[in-house]
Amino acid sequence: MNQAIREAYRTFVIFRSLAAVFRYTRPALDFRYIALEGPPGVGKTALAERLAAHVDATTVLEETDNPFLGDFYAERPGAALQAQLFFLLNRHRQQESLRQADLFSQATICDYLFEKDRIYAYLNLDDNDLFIYQRLYELLARDVALPDLVVYLQAPTELLNKRLRAREAEADAYRPNPAYIQKLNEAYQHFFFHYAATPLLVVETSQLDLTGSDDTLDDLLKQIRGMGRGTRYYVPRTRG
């Protein structure tokens, strides 16, 4: 009798432990590699970090330091190509290290898409510089893995500039010219209107709290989990 009680208690402890494991396991994603994209100020990095924490994924965050940016903003001759190539080589090095390390065995959320480099190149470079850039880009892009899903975060230019002004005040960061952000936002819209390399979720972020609301995060995860092939548009409804 005592043996039967001990066995029953042992079984109870095992099932209770398993229940605890399943209870606290973070929800998984079907997509192993997700890239978030959008213009400056849209909230890519903050969302990547929150999503990764929520689903126990690793993050790949873009390295934004560039010694040529000051000269580029000052419109010094040759600085645009120098800044663009520096970003391109940095992004390729980061993507190549990921591929070699096989980090995609765990879900990975990246706050940029490698192809976005061309958005800036076509906006910033003249024809001669663009010819040089394009030859190098085509060579490097062969080594870069495509994401399983791209999430394009949209926002009106006025909202982007408002967020960038707040960021500048908080961190003493450089804020690009509002007219440049307008052109960049339009370039992003054009790029993703024609994008077809991977499944694409387009998210209108004007009414989204990407930094604080768990409900917002849960709603977005539902959209991500429901993605199939092609492009889907998600325009959240305002609450209340």
What spans do the regions from the language model cover?
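Glycine-rich phosphate-binding loop used to anchor ATP phosphates in small-molecule kinases
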Residues: 79, 83-145
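A glycine- and Lys/Arg-enriched "phosphate-lid" helix/loop adjacent to the NTP-binding pocket
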Residues: 118-189
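P-loop (Walker A) phosphate-binding loop of NTP-binding proteins
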Residues: 39
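Conserved substrate/cofactor phosphate-moiety recognition/catalytic segment
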Residues: 53-90
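Hydrophobic anchor at the beta1->P-loop junction of P-loop NTPases
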Residues: 36
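Conserved lysine of the Walker
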Residues: 44
